[in-house]
Amino acid sequence: MTLTLTPGAATLAQLQDIWANNRAVTLCPSAHAGIKAAQALVAKAAAGDDAVYGVNTGFGKLASVKIAAKDVATLQRNLILSHCCGVGEPLDAATTRLMMVLKLLSLGRGASGVAMTTLEIIENMLARGVTPVIPSQGSVGASGDLAPLAHMAAAMIGEGEAVFEGTRMAAGDALRRAGITPIVLGAKEGLALINGTQFSTACALVGLWGAWRNAATCVLTCALSTDAIMGSTAPLQDAIHTLRGHAGQIAVARAQRALMAGSQIRESHVEGDTRVQDPYCIRCQPQVTGAAMDILHFAGRTLEIEANAVTDNPLVLVEDELIVSGGNFHAEPVGFAADQIAVAVSELGAIAQRRVALMVDPTLSFDLPPFLTPDPGLNSGLMIAEVTTAALMSENKHLANPCTTDSTPTSANQEDHVSMAAHAARRLLRMNANLNVILGVEAMCGAQGIEFRAPLETSAPLKAAMAVLRAHVPTIAEDRYMAPSIEAASALVANGTLAACVDLPAFVKGEAA
């Protein structure tokens, strides 16, 4: 199904649908008039004698070099080819397509001066499944994501590589097989295509969606862990959290309380429990996961604005009949958002790992067997699974260090402060993958611990979640080859199956709380 988007008004839900479901898109026809008006203004400037950056001049430090009218098309083509300097593993197809959609939205605002045919080829490539090969490294996030977007633009002119029908090939061949004619770039069009933050923003959005899913999963895995160690639900009382007032904290406490309602395990120790308080990793779950959710919402709002933004340079101001240079290509907002997401992901993993450590330690787990195995000594149980989570937690802590603070001058000091947003956003994929494993192992430990509490039963919602887990990860009755079980549990986190067990629809969908 083709989704019609209005430039400036795309929602995170629409963008997530496009990314997850391989949607084709088209721009709302109401955007066409503004696009054409801006292109006419650029054409007028290209035919004139005045130097206009990006239209009839060189680029960056070479902006003072005037280009003859007869060389304008060559200028744009040379720009694309010279900027195809990306390295590293290719960006995955879904994120590449999302990047193309974001570029379409930006150009569709009518402030870039490109021809309708340039937007139409992006629409056609999305509809017919021609996906440019985009090396994932090489952008410093100002002047936009130059290298990765140049590889996208190269495919549009029949250069570089693309994937079509599952096969990587020359982009010209891919376009031909899809029945698409490569475009010839007009004045400013090459610059409009590569100036922008769409690579960084696409990667950050994917990281955001993964973090939202993991935050919801964290509520479930903590509920399992809490019942496994016979923890208290008293700290989940609504009055505690409304007194503080943070929306995320309130929502997490309510959701976890609902997950644990009716647990026989919990009811068995409401009275007479010798423990006064649970460790922070149990007791402060709403405060930590709730804070993570709140910061994810803040980052999400930033990225939604950026997804609809014009981040080209120079900008075509049709009403004022001006083409003006600015700095909207600087991806600092995206870099900040990605750094915020990284901190949230790291903290979700840090507190979850402590719950795993709690459950496998017989001195802390309230009479659970060592390493959650029925025959400790002969069997090691989940001993090294916990060590794996510690390794991944530490890795994520390192990856959470801010990237935006690491600016370096480039391009002969013309571009002397950069955002590093691309790196900030890309590392989120690895961090979420690590967190998937930590939460998968926590789910395994929590379920195993609850089973040791028999004949007492957990709540109906947690039994349902355990049934989902047990369909893929059997109870660990004795030592076995563990890697497939960890992989299966992690997959249930990554694909959202466990998150779906939690009643946090607003957060899972990325809507305001």
From Swiss-Prot:
<comment type="similarity">
    <text>Belongs to the PAL/histidase family.</text>
</comment>
<dbReference type="GO" id="GO:0019557">
    <property type="term" value="P:L-histidine catabolic process to glutamate and formate"/>
</dbReference>
<dbReference type="GO" id="GO:0004397">
    <property type="term" value="F:histidine ammonia-lyase activity"/>
</dbReference>
<protein>
    <recommendedName>
        <fullName>Histidine ammonia-lyase</fullName>
        <ecNumber>4.3.1.3</ecNumber>
    </recommendedName>
</protein>
<dbReference type="InterPro" id="IPR024083">
    <property type="entry name" value="Fumarase/histidase_N"/>
</dbReference>
<dbReference type="InterPro" id="IPR005921">
    <property type="entry name" value="HutH"/>
</dbReference>
<dbReference type="GO" id="GO:0005737">
    <property type="term" value="C:cytoplasm"/>
</dbReference>
<keyword id="KW-0369">Histidine metabolism</keyword>
<dbReference type="InterPro" id="IPR008948">
    <property type="entry name" value="L-Aspartase-like"/>
</dbReference>
<comment type="pathway">
    <text>Amino-acid degradation; L-histidine degradation into L-glutamate; N-formimidoyl-L-glutamate from L-histidine: step 1/3.</text>
</comment>
<dbReference type="GO" id="GO:0019556">
    <property type="term" value="P:L-histidine catabolic process to glutamate and formamide"/>
</dbReference>
<keyword id="KW-0963">Cytoplasm</keyword>
<feature type="cross-link" description="5-imidazolinone (Ala-Gly)">
    <location>
        <begin position="142"/>
        <end position="144"/>
    </location>
</feature>
<keyword id="KW-0456">Lyase</keyword>
<feature type="modified residue" description="2,3-didehydroalanine (Ser)">
    <location>
        <position position="143"/>
    </location>
</feature>
<dbReference type="InterPro" id="IPR001106">
    <property type="entry name" value="Aromatic_Lyase"/>
</dbReference>
<dbReference type="InterPro" id="IPR022313">
    <property type="entry name" value="Phe/His_NH3-lyase_AS"/>
</dbReference>
<dbReference type="Pfam" id="PF00221">
    <property type="entry name" value="Lyase_aromatic"/>
</dbReference>
